[in-house]
Amino acid sequence: MCIEDIKALPVGELAAKDCALFLWITFPCLCEALEVLTAWGFSYKTVAFVWVKQNRRNDDLFTGMGYWTRANAEICILATKGHPKRVDAGVRQVILSHIEEHSKKPDEARERIVRLMGDIPRVELFARQSPEGWDVWGNEVECTAHLPMEETPCCG
């Protein structure tokens, strides 16, 4: 799915009036991610999480590829629509955890999102698994959320 297709997803139309969006990105795609937020009608607020990756088999830091420096972290940015409420001011930004399957994000991030925002309805787009308490949409899961589109590239 190209960036224009992602920007065209009706996420902003389906989102609650007051809600938060957490978007995982790699550093080289930062500008495109901000374009997506804007296209969906959200305002960038901060970096919610910095995932410092550890190797699968030990606690050493993972060393990935990189354009300038060797990447070993990913970020999850936080954007809002309206005025969502934060329910826990003690949620920390840095997540230090081991990498798992390709592109799988740490479960701890979902747990922190629930702590931060409360036990409210939530959906994971481009999901790779179906975590309890979350609706999911993507081509690697059985979708429980549906995006009305002329042509649905992921769940069609």
Language-model segments: residues:
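Class I S-adenosyl-L-methionine-dependent methyltransferase catalytic core
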Residues: 1-156
